[in-house]
Amino acid sequence: SGVTREARERVVRFLSEVLNVEEYPLTVMDRPVESETCKIVENSYRATLLAFMDEWSRFAEKHGVDIVKVIQAIKVRPTHSNIMFPGPGIGGYCLPKDGALGQWGIRHLLKDEELNFPITTAAININDARGVHAAELTCDALAAMDKPVAGAAVLICGCSYREDVGDTRYSGSELIARRLAELAAVI
């Protein structure tokens, strides 16, 4: 999108040169606010789904349910093949911030003080706590082996914010490492 027709055309030309628009066609929106809303809604949706899966992974932890097996069974249905596995938190340069950024923009740029986003806010809070929970599980596992956290050598694998990506920005495992280091574990 762009604020004028010429701006939209220039954006399309530029993006067509740097993106594979054959495989990933561009969708041109009428206004920049629509383009930004697409991005923020998509990322807030995914963050909300991951927060939802956090609820069910905690249920599974407590009741001995193999959540991986459950998700694999659900994925058999073509309409449910995109269900996500819960992890130690959301990361990357978009998911952790976009829900809050959208709310900020609505209040400060669009001057709308009436709208509230309770689901998005809850998802942000749940996802922010997931890394701490993973660190607590690590502490519990060490305690079960009669090993104090202080001085325990802990290897953290899978440090990117999602599988098959080499980018570690705002990774959930970063919070785990910080929390365990605060408790004097050797990372």
Language model features with spans:
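Structural/interface elements that position substrates and couple domains in central-metabolism enzymes
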Residues: 1-187
